[in-house]
């Protein structure tokens, strides 16, 4: 059942965002939890940060206790109070095989009792960082991240406080990982369309009712994306053999010139650039 568990084929529309990382986490949990890592083979250490020899030596023979996610980061908790961060960068993917079949751009291979778990990264922007369990959340990669969008902490009252004195556009605010962790270009466009809010709206001009719509849309869009295996991943098969693409449910992202699914014949989706990133919206129904 787990042969070629991750059938990504390394095709991305964009950097993996929270739903793609969460989908990866859930799949890895099926394979790795309570398993001992018998071998760590660093095939190519050339990632964003070079994989140290220390990483291989310390991770080897440790058991995987749990795998968490913070924003777009995976956090592996191991036995003997060790932990490490994994970030997928632009094109990082894991695959699982019963027999290791080398592929171009393989970087790290983890050997457990029945399977090989391989990290592959074409563009080499991903990385792995070893730390202690006690210190992992104080890592410079994690300690400045904002709140988790799917947590109970994200409520309308808190969101209003966050945007109250911000003079930037709402799209840029949502993209800022220091405020809310894990949102990226695809989901920010989808969230704002769902909420009926223009990406150009200035934060401190957004009403309490509009803020509530954004918060509800954040949770709704992300949960639906996770349920459908994410957007950026192509040909993804989860541990139950289900294949699904959230790209089938995109309302605005990458739909420039197409008819708005809310307004029907009366308006088309526009594309504009905000902070060097493509942004998609309907000028008629997003105010």
Give the ranges of each region predicted by the language model.
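Basic, nucleic-acid-binding surfaces and adjacent catalytic neighborhoods in DNA/RNA-processing proteins
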Residues: 36-55, 60, 68, 73, ...
């Amino acid at each position: 059942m787990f042969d070629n568990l991750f059938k990504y084929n390394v095709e991305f529309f964009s950097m993996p965002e929270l739903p793609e990382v969460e989908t990866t986490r859930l799949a890895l949990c099926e394979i790795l939890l309570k398993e001992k890592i018998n071998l760590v083979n660093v095939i190519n250490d050339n990632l964003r940060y070079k994989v140290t020899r220390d990483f291989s030596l310390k991770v080897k023979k440790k058991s995987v206790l749990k795998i968490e996610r913070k924003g777009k980061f995976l956090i592996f908790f191991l036995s003997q109070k060790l932990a490490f961060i994994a970030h997928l960068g632009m094109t990082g993917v894991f695959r699982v095989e019963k027999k290791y079949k080398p592929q171009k751009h393989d970087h790290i291979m983890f050997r457990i009792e029945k399977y090989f778990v391989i990290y592959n990264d074409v563009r080499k922007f991903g990385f792995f960082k070893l730390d202690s369990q006690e210190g992992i959340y104080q890592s410079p990669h994690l300690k400045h991240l904002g709140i988790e969008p799917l947590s109970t902490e994200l409520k309308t009252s808190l969101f209003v406080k966050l945007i109250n004195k911000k003079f930037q556009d709402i799209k840029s605010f949502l993209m800022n990982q220091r405020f809310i962790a894990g949102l990226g270009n695809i989901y920010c466009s989808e969230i704002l369309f769902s909420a009926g809010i223009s990406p150009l709206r200035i934060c401190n001009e957004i009403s309490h009712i509009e803020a509530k719509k954004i918060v509800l849309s954040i949770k709704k869009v992300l949960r639906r994306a996770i349920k459908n295996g994410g957007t950026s991943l192509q040909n993804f098969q989860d541990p139950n053999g289900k294949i699904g693409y959230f790209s089938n449910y995109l309302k605005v992202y990458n739909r420039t010139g197409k008819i708005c699914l809310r307004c029907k014949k009366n308006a088309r989706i526009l594309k504009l650039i905000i902070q060097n990133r493509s942004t998609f919206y309907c000028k008629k129904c997003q105010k």
